[in-house]
Amino acid sequence: MSELTLGQAAKLAEEYAARGLAKELASLRAAWDDEVEAAARHADYRVRSQAYRALAQFRYRQKLELLRRGLDDESPGVRGSALIALEALSRDHPGDVNKFRSLLHEMAARDANVAVRRLAIVCLKNGTPLPDTIRLLEGIAGNDEDDAEVRRTARSVATLLVKRSRAK
């Protein structure tokens, strides 16, 4: 697999997943496991960002603890990539969001980077529609001092979660 870069291998993994080639995806995943781990710990934030994006492309659901490192990273770009990966991995697995709910709440409410805040809010849509999450999002949506896009995203996700909670 050394003839491929991590980005190319991740793109190939995404293609395998889209085509339902589970055996090929598993083989590629096994071959790139160590490289993804090493990239997630790299000194360069761009390499770390690529590693966290690759977690979703490779469908590495067993690497949620590694994903936590990305959510706690000093770089907003890395945190954003980790959030994008979490959103993708949690679409069919709300438990993934639930594992990180308190951290996502903190990021949605207080992260210094507006894009990271919005991505954290978007991740919350895939979780269980709990009242504390809905209250947090409604509070963000109603805060005129917050960024307009953050408020709009929070309002949209809160509305979706309320609908889902009533459908149960």
Regions found by a protein language model. Give the residues of each.
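Structural detector for internal amphipathic alpha-helices that build alpha-solenoid repeat scaffolds
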Residues: 3-28, 46-60, 69, 80-94, ...
